[in-house]
Amino acid sequence: MAMTVKKNDNEVRIQWRVADIKIPNNEIKNVTQDQDIHAVPEENGKEISRIGSTFGKTNRVLIDTDQHLYIIYTQNDQKVYNELTK
């Protein structure tokens, strides 16, 4: 199943396999792209969710909230980033 990432006026919705993740827009503090294969996110007490297949991919989009860090593994990182920052 392909991953879909959509943003509307209220939330970001990420669907992948059986996961259906909704993140309210007002909770999102930062969205960044990361292509460092050796990067390990700083936890800072946050819960971390890795979404997507990591095999053979270094392209990631990170969604940072106060309580959570979402790491999206994708080969379409620019498309996902553009959707999240529109």
Curated annotation (Swiss-Prot):
One Pfam family assigned to this protein is: bPH_8
Judging by the UniProt lineage, the source's domain of life is Bacteria
Of which family is this protein a member? Answer: Belongs to the UPF0457 family.
> What is the protein's name according to its record?
UPF0457 protein SERP1772
Species source reads Staphylococcus epidermidis (strain ATCC 35984 / DSM 28319 / BCRC 17069 / CCUG 31568 / BM 3577 / RP62A)
